[in-house]
């Protein structure tokens, strides 16, 4: 098409004549036409034949394209070993894409023994030729210290080279460096600018982080609608945390019309990827049965998945199910195990319920000191029932030294929150004190 009207059929005709004479450049170009169906009927088998003829004459671009065909099994039986062999031939001639793909093979052990140092060497060669993906991967190696001494400043330098070419992943990683001040002076506006560039190219992690900034209003004008829009874009690409966040937005009507169906959809997508918070929230929905038909068995299944990942709230709710035999066979020891796990993570309700069991000796050896310890942990978080029960322990001297002043203090804290039992207990003590004073001699 240089200085002459573009004519694909004519080009194919001329490439064919030249290819028959053994010209590797013509064989390569004709192969591309056959592979893509440009100016001639698509024929991948013919393309492979021509790539092979050209590659056998040492043409590095043909070696590379043929390697890709072997790697993907396009028009030829998949053969990673053969692909590596061809990438190597092409890479040795300095072809940047071949160097990069060969580095990927060495990095992951595809068709060849894993060798991170060799991968770094090849990323370096490709990166020096300006190949953005190689620059990015090399930057990751420097950031992590994989196959090369850790060097954050070098990583930033390489991320910058790649990002300046518009590579979305590099823009994102560079943004993270600017936001955290890693290997470069902290610069939040620059980070936001790079997150935006990356997000605009559809990179899900950038969309998610940018959404977080819009949601919280950190370093950017708060815009909940924009946040939801970006969460959704990220979620639709399978970002599990974005799926969870957009589900929360739909469930509560934050920045979007309340839509329980969509909330459940995104909770489910996130839960299926193992997000413990999504599993827990979805379990609550099935457990309560307010928004969908109640399904306690499904709830228990989801609580279990979440609890197994250490979610304290799920551990507590699952403990309740085992305690009551709700959706699962009653199992007090299992309930105690789950209460304990949840309580250790600071769940005040688990601390309280476990304290009750120790106080009463239900399913566990009675231990009033342990009960007081757990009531205290829960009460310190402001839980009124725990404050009331702890006050009772201080009043009676059960599991702790008797201390009426402390009891009054705790009853008062609970009563302020509207705890009726605490109000009655406080009144009882004060009435008793008042009565004692009346009986005292004047």
Q: Each PLM stretch: what is its role?
A:
Residues 1-2, 15, 21-23, 36-38, ...:
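Short helix-capping/linker turns of helical repeat alpha-solenoids
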Residues 402-420, 427-430:
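TPR/TPR-like (Sel1-like) alpha-helical repeat modules
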Residues 29-36, 65-72, 101-108, 137-144, ...:
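Hydrophobic face of amphipathic alpha-helices that form TPR/SEL1-like repeat modules
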């Amino acid at each position: 098409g240089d200085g002459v009207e573009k004519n694909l059929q004519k080009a194919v005709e001329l490439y064919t004549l030249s290819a028959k004479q053994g010209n590797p450049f013509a064989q390569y170009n004709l192969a591309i036409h056959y592979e893509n169906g440009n100016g001639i009927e698509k024929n991948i088998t013919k393309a492979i034949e021509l790539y092979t003829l050209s590659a056998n004459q040492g043409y590095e671009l043909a070696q590379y394209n043929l390697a890709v065909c072997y790697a993907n099994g396009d028009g030829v039986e998949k053969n990673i070993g053969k692909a590596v062999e061809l990438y190597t031939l092409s890479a040795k001639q300095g072809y940047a894409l071949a160097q990069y793909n060969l580095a990927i093979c060495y990095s992951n052990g595809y068709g060849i023994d894993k060798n991170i140092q060799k991968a770094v060497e090849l990323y370096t060669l490709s990166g020096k030729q300006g190949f953005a993906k190689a620059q990015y991967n090399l930057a990751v190696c420097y950031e992590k210290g994989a196959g090369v001494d850790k060097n954050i400043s070098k990583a930033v330098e390489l991320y910058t080279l790649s990002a300046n070419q518009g590579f979305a992943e590099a823009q994102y990683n560079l943004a993270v460096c600017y936001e955290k001040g890693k290997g470069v002076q902290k610069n939040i506006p620059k980070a936001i600018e790079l997150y935006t560039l990356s997000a605009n190219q559809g990179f899900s992690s950038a969309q998610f982080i940018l959404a977080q900034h819009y949601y919280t209003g950190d370093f950017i004008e708060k815009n909940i609608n924009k946040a939801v829009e970006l969460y959704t874009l990220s979620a639709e690409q399978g970002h599990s945390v974005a799926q969870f966040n957009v589900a929360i937005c739909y469930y509560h009507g934050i920045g979007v019309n309340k839509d329980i169906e969509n909330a459940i959809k995104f909770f489910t997508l996130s839960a299926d990827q193992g997000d413990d918070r999504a599993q827990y929230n979805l379990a609550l929905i099935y457990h309560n049965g307010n928004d969908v038909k109640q399904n306690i068995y499904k709830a228990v299944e989801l609580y279990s998945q979440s609890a197994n990942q250490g979610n304290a709230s799920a551990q507590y709710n699952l403990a309740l199910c085992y305690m009551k035999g709700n959706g699962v066979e009653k199992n007090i020891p299992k309930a105690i195990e789950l209460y304990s796990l949840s309580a250790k993570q600071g769940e005040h309700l688990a601390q309280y319920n476990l304290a009750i069991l120790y106080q009463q000796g239900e399913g566990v050896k009675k231990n009033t000191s342990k009960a007081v310890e757990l009531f205290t942990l829960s009460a310190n978080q402001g839980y009124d029932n725990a404050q009331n029960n702890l006050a009772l322990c201080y009043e009676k001297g059960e599991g702790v030294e008797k201390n009426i002043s402390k009891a009054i203090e705790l009853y008062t804290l609970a009563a302020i929150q509207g705890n009726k039992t605490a109000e009655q207990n406080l009144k009882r003590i004060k009435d008793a004190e008042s009565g004692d004073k009346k009986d005292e001699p004047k």
